[in-house]
UniProtKB/Swiss-Prot annotation:
Divisome component that associates with the complex late in its assembly, after the Z-ring is formed, and is dependent on DivIC and PBP2B for its recruitment to the divisome. Together with EzrA, is a key component of the system that regulates PBP1 localization during cell cycle progression. Its main role could be the removal of PBP1 from the cell pole after pole maturation is completed. Also contributes to the recruitment of PBP1 to the division complex. Not essential for septum formation. Residues 61-82 are annotated as: Disordered. It is found in: Cytoplasm. Keywords: Cell cycle, Cell division, Cell shape, Coiled coil, Cytoplasm. This is Cell cycle protein GpsB. One of its GO terms (biological process) is regulation of cell shape. The gene is gpsB. Residues 37-63 form a coiled coil. Forms polymers through the coiled coil domains. Interacts with PBP1, MreC and EzrA. One of its GO terms (cellular component) is cytoplasm. The keyword Coiled coil applies.
Length: 113
């Protein structure tokens, strides 16, 4: 691919030599030829980028969609840990109550000794 010759600053700062009847026609024509080449390069570049975008969009539509939400068959490990720790805590509380009911009198009797 051809390279771009002028920047916007180059075009803005371009000066032409003066002749009796105005600017040098040859200089202006050469400059405009180069500007035209730049515009053709830009057009080619834009066309290739648009084609690349279209190709990427098509490729994206062909790929299966991946959901960002976790699937029900694979629960979130943090949720599982939190719910199991709550379950363990509840079990420990119940076990403590049962021990107090069953062994409470024995514990009180042993403290009197």
């Amino acid at each position: 691919m051809t390279s771009i010759i002028f920047s916007a600053k180059d075009i803005f700062e371009q000066e032409f030599g003066r002749e009796v009847r105005g600017y040098s026609k040859v200089e202006v024509d050469e400059f405009l030829d180069d500007v035209i080449k730049d515009y053709e390069t830009y057009a080619t570049l834009v066309k290739s980028l648009r084609q690349e975008i279209a190709d990427l969009k098509e490729e994206l539509t062909r790929k299966p969609q991946v959901s960002s939400a976790p699937s029900p068959s694979h629960p979130d490990p943090i949720d599982v840990a939190a719910s199991s720790s709550m379950t363990n805590f509840d079990i420990l509380k119940r076990l403590n109550r049962l021990e107090k009911e069953v062994f409470g009198k024995q514990i009180l009797d042993n403290t009197d000794l």
